[in-house]
């Protein structure tokens, strides 16, 4: 029965090795959980920034469309003024030629 006392120290050693491995895995898992939580926080911040950027882009698009329309009308007015001046000039020339 000498196997009883010698088996106990070997068994304790294996149990201690297993416990050390379990502790190591637990530490690794804690680090992994912390990394996942950090990643989640960063993703949340990135999502918020993306939403803000989308809102800014929509506002820019609206402002650009209004500005485009404003300058289109301004261009139309300039063409109308130019055509009116040209017509008045042509009428003056016609009246001057006819009256001469």
Swiss-Prot record:
It is found in: Early endosome membrane; Recycling endosome membrane; Synapse, Synaptosome. SUPFAM superfamilies: SNARE fusion complex. Its main location: membrane. Interacts with POPDC1 (via the C-terminus cytoplasmic tail). Interacts with BCAP31; involved in VAMP3 export from the endoplasmic reticulum. Interacts with BAIAP3; this interaction is increased in the presence of calcium. Interacts with PICALM. The keyword Transport applies. One of its GO terms (cellular component) is plasma membrane. Belongs to the synaptobrevin family. The keyword NAD does not apply. The modification N-acetylserine is found at residue 2. PROSITE patterns: SYNAPTOBREVIN (PS00417), V_SNARE (PS50892). SNARE involved in vesicular transport from the late endosomes to the trans-Golgi network. Gene3D superfamilies: 1.20.5.110. Signal peptide: none annotated. This is Vesicle-associated membrane protein 3. Residues 14-74 form the v-SNARE coiled-coil homology domain. Keywords: Acetylation, Coiled coil, Endosome, Isopeptide bond, Membrane, Protein transport, Synapse, Synaptosome, Transmembrane, Transmembrane helix, Transport, Ubl conjugation. Residues 2-77 are cytoplasmic. Ubiquitinated by RNF167 at Lys-66, Lys-68 and Lys-77, regulating the recycling endosome pathway. It is a single-pass type IV membrane protein. The chain crosses the membrane at residues 78-98. Residues 99-100 are vesicular. One of its GO terms (biological process) is protein transport. There is a cross-link at residues 66, 68, 77 (Glycyl lysine isopeptide (Lys-Gly) (interchain with G-Cter in ubiquitin)).
